[in-house]
């Protein structure tokens, strides 16, 4: 391989697992670049690499929905402690607003939050609701949520991370910046030259610059998030409100499954519902730390309705009952995957 191209690929992280695809594509668009290429050719090649690698970045802008965010919060299955914490925060902000209106002193409150919890426990959903509540309270003008992670903030070579993080922050102004698995910005061992540190420094600076226009919510596993917060005094001073998202119980996962059924017009017999509860209880009792919680329930539902479709594929003139009812056999296919569930 051309040595200069090889250096460039290493710099942007393309010579890793799956990097061969990048090399092949670069071969199509840049094989004419030789050992003595000029700076313009190298810049063009680097731009091409950037345009390819940035497609892998994780970033989603979620505009606020219409409706009552407080009712949406109350309608969530489980998460009673989370609801109490969010309501408590909203009550405090409301009271401070009233005190300010009467000319009284107000207590400073940090709107930034740490969400502890396993995957699929509702952290992203609640972050979106919090953004809308903050808009309702006058804390934020828009209340939208920009959702990202390490890949969406960190560059692949020196000098890219700062501008990239700034770009994400700019999209989040007047709303919430939600960073999932934020602990990945500080690898275990705390490599000082890691690009995650640059992203953190940039975010902390922008939190100060835009203190009235930006709310940051960081989320991830409890122990890892505590390590993340403890890694930087700036994080410790800005994040002082923590909300714990517990794993769902078997009964709650059953309710989540039934919620999907109701939304999509499916039914269960009493016998099949009893089987459903038994299987979710088993999954909860044998889960590992990567268990998907609500995502698991959704996946079981999607696989179950696919199994129903396969079962009825050759039948004609189906009545409403057959079109809507899920059987135990359908659910067995839905629960077939044992990923993140111990024997």
Residue ranges, per PLM feature:
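C-terminal engagement/docking regions of AAA+ P-loop ATPases
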Residues: 307-343
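Walker A/P-loop
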Residues: 106-143, 170
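Conserved C-terminal "switch" segment of AAA+ ATPases
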Residues: 137-142, 224-230, 236, 245-290, ...
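Alpha-helical transmembrane anchor segments and their immediate juxtamembrane flanks
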Residues: 2-41
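C-terminal helical "lid" of AAA+/P-loop NTPase domains
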Residues: 292-314
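Short glycine-rich substrate-engagement loop in P-loop NTPases that contacts/grips substrate
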Residues: 142-172
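Canonical AAA+ ATPase core
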Residues: 184-190, 198-245, 263-264
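Pre-Walker A (pre-P-loop) alpha-helix and adjacent loop at the N terminus of AAA/AAA+ ATPase modules
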Residues: 69-111
């Amino acid at each position: 391989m051309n040595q200069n191209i090889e250096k460039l690929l290493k710099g942007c992280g393309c010579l890793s697992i799956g990097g061969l695809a990048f090399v092949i594509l670069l071969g199509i668009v840049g094989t004419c670049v030789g050992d003595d290429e000029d700076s313009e050719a190298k810049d063009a090649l680097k731009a091409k690499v950037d345009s390819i690698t940035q497609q892998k970045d994780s970033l989603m802008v979620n505009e606020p929905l219409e409706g009552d965010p407080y009712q949406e919060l109350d309608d969530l299955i489980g998460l009673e402690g989370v609801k109490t914490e969010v309501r408590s925060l909203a009550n405090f902000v409301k009271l401070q607003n009233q005190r300010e209106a009467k000319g009284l002193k107000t207590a400073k409150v940090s709107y930034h939050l740490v969400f502890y919890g396993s995957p699929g426990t509702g952290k992203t959903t609640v972050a979106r609701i919090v953004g809308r509540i903050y808009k309702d309270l006058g804390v934020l003008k828009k209340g939208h949520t920009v959702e990202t992670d390490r890949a969406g903030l960190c560059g692949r070579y020196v000098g890219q991370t700062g501008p990239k993080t700034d770009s994400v922050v700019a999209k989040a102004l007047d709303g919430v910046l939600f960073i999932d698995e934020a602990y990945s910005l500080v690898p275990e061992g705390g490599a000082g030259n890691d690009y995650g540190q640059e992203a953190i420094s940039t975010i902390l600076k922008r939190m100060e610059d835009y203190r009235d226009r930006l709310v940051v919510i960081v989320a991830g596993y409890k122990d890892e998030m505590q390590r993340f917060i403890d890694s930087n005094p700036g994080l410790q001073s800005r994040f002082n409100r923590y909300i714990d998202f517990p794993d769902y119980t078997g009964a709650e996962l059953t309710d989540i499954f039934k919620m999907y059924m109701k939304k999509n017009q499916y039914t269960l017999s009493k016998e099949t519902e009893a089987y459903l509860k038994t299987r979710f209880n088993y999954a909860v009792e044998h889960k590992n730390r990567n268990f998907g919680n609500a995502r698991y329930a959704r996946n079981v539902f999607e696989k179950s309705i696919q199994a129903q479709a396969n079962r009825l594929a050759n039948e004609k003139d189906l009545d409403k009952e057959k079109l809507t009812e899920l059987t135990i056999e359908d659910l067995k296919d839905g629960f077939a995957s044992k990923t993140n569930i111990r024997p």
